[in-house]
Amino acid sequence: MEWHDGKHRCRWANPKNELYIRYHDEEWGKLVRDDAKLFEMLILECFQAGLSWECILNKREAFRAAFDEFDLDKVCGYDEAKEEALRTAPGIVHNRLKIHAAVTNARIFREIQNEYGSFDAYLIHWTGDAVIHETGKVSSPLSDAVSADLKKRGMKFAGTVIIYSYLQAVGRIESHEDGCFLGYKM
C-alpha cells in the first residue's frame, strides 16, 4: 500500500489513524531495554487480549493516568479498593479480571526483577540478547516457553499469542512485513 508520504508500511498499520502510524514508525519493533517501558507494554498487551491493539493504543494515555504512569512500585501496592476504583476510571478497559491481572502481574514482574536484576535481563535469558527476525506468525517456540514460565510464576493474560505480540512490540522479535520501510534488511 502506498501511503501519503510515499513510504510502505506493514498492512496492519491503519493509514487513517495518525497515532497508530506513529506507533508503527517510532515504537513497534524497536528494542526496549528500559524496565519501566517493558512493564507498561506488558500491562497494555495483557489488556489487549480479545481486543484490537488499536483500541488499546487509543486508550494508552487514559491507562497511563489510571495506572499512575505505570509506576511499578505504585501498581504493586494497589489494594482491592484501588482495583475497584479502576473499574470506573475514565477511558480504560474496565474488565475486572484484567485489572486484577495487571496488579498481580506487576508483583510478578517485580519478583522477576529481583531474581534477574532487571526484566530486560530476564528477556535476555530467553533470547540470548538476539533480535529474532520472522514474519507471519502469532506464536513461536520462544513465546511458548516465555508464556509457560510467566504462567508458572502466576501471571495472567500471558498466553503465547499475547507474549508473542509483546516480544514483537518491545523489539525482541522483529516482524515488519516485507516491503515495509522498517523491515529487516540483510
Task: Please describe what each predicted stretch is.
Residues M1-M186:
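HhH-family (HhH-GPD) DNA N-glycosylase catalytic core used in base-excision repair
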